């Protein structure tokens, strides 16, 4: 009997506890609802005169996860009470501000960021934010992506982006940033992508990226950079892709990218590069793609690619190259035979001569369809008025004289009249009307018919003598000296 009574008492006690907890939860919920009821639901603003209107996937209070907000009517002050209304939708994860009026938003709305404890994606565009102050994003522990295009941002203060431990992407494209100072990006352990395209950046301070150890992609294209040095890229040991297209670089100095140990893709298209130092790409042992299209390169010197042992994509389109010697690409030539390789030389004024004969062999040996297609359409220029012969380089026994020149001229004339008339394209005449250039498909000219420049033949003519030739020269000189001495003595005796 006592046991039954005890069990009954426990059951009543349990029910009482549950009822009490339920009342407390209801009271707590009522209290929260009362708190949120003080704020206007930003997803259901009825006031047409409101400075901000937001459109959400749900207008029910405390349920929206996405909000697309528009700033109207001359803008809104940083301390405007309206910002507190974001408490009505505390679950927002993705927030966008579109500014319709010039000057409508001149700051980063930190009071919104701090209220949204689940915010992951922040996008602001068409504002008039001159400067981003220190800690502008309130040390958020949830922000993953910050996108700020077309906001007229000109200045980034020290630690503008700081202590954002989850941040992985930052985009500042199409602003007016002119320089990057040190410590702008600070304690961002997960930042992987930084987009700074279409600004007016002309100065990278030494170490401006030194805290971005995990960055894998950096876009600096369409800026006004005129020079880059090794110190600009300190800390970017894990960077994989660097885009510096359409800047104003004129040369690449020694070890300019040596801090980028993991770099695999380097884009330098659309600059004004005329010279690359022999160690310009030193240290880029992992580089696989190098794009130098639309520059002003007149030559690619031997040794420039020696450190890039894994390179299999080389884009040299639209430069001023007159030739590309095999020695310049010897270190990566085998890579160009792989399935995914590419070498592109279109848009240069390559001369049709024996210095390009190695491209025939590459065309036959490569497995890459892209390489074959690129080389098949490659044009070169045959100049009918220059002293170019069609002979192979040989060591002539005698110096080149006028008779040899006539022979060269004859063979050149025969070549032009009897071969490849159907391949002739785009005849070009110089201003002096004395020189005609013919564009031809390089691979349609057999290697044995590719002419060699006179200077190459000249250099071959005066190659260093062999040991036998040196020995013979010394012996002949000695005999001549003895004979001269004897003749001189006989002449003296005859006089006496």
Which sequence ranges carry the predicted segments?
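Extracellular leucine-rich repeat
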Residues: 2-496
């Amino acid at each position: 009997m006592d046991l039954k009574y005890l069990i009954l008492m426990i059951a009543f006690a349990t029910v009482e506890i549950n009822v009490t907890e339920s009342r407390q939860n209801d009271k707590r919920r009522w209290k929260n609802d009362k708190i949120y009821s003080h704020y206007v639901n930003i997803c259901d603003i009825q006031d047409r005169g409101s400075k901000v209107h937001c459109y959400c996937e749900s207008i029910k209070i405390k349920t929206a996860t996405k909000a697309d907000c528009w700033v109207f009517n001359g803008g809104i002050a940083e301390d405007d009470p309206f910002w507190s209304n974001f408490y009505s939708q505390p679950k927002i994860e993705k927030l966008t501000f579109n500014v319709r009026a010039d000057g409508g938003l001149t700051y980063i709305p930190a009071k919104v960021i701090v209220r949204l404890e689940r915010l992951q994606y922040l996008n602001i565009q068409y504002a008039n934010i001159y400067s981003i102050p220190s800690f502008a994003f309130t040390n958020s522990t949830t922000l993953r992506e910050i996108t700020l295009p077309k906001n007229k941002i000109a200045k980034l203060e020290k630690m503008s982006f700081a202590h954002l431990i989850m941040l992985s992407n930052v985009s500042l494209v199409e602003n007016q940033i002119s320089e990057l100072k040190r410590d702008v990006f600070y304690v961002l352990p997960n930042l992987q992508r930084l987009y700074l395209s279409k600004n007016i950046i002309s100065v990278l301070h030494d170490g401006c990226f030194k805290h971005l150890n995990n960055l894998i992609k950096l876009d600096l294209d369409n800026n006004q950079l005129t020079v880059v040095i090794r110190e600009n890229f300190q800390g970017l040991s894990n960077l994989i892709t660097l885009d510096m297209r359409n800047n104003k670089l004129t040369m690449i100095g020694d070890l300019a990218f040596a801090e980028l140990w993991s770099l695999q893709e380097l884009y330098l298209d659309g600059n004004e590069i005329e010279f690359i130092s022999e160690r310009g790409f030193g240290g880029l042992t992992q580089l696989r793609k190098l794009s130098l299209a639309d520059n002003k390169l007149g030559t690619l010197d031997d040794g420039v690619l020696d450190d890039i042992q894994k390179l299999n994509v080389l884009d040299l389109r639209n430069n001023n190259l007159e030739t590309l010697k095999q020695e310049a690409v010897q270190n990566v030539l085998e890579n160009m035979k792989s399935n995914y390789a590419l070498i592109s030389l279109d848009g240069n004024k390559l001369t049709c001569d024996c210095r390009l004969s190695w491209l025939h062999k590459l065309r036959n040996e490569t497995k890459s369809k892209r390489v074959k297609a690129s080389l098949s359409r490659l044009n070169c220029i045959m100049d009918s008025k220059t002293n170019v012969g069609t002979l192979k380089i040989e060591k002539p026994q005698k110096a080149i004289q006028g008779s040899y020149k006539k022979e060269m001229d004859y063979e050149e004339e025969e070549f032009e009249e009897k071969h490849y008339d159907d391949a002739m394209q785009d005849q070009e005449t110089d201003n002096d009307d004395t020189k005609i250039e013919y564009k031809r498909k390089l691979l349609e000219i057999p290697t044995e018919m590719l002419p060699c420049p006179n200077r190459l033949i000249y250099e071959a003519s005066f190659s260093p003598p062999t040991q036998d030739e040196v020995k013979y020269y010394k012996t002949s000189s000695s005999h001549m000296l003895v004979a001269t001495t004897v003749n001189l003595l006989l002449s003296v005796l005859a006089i006496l």
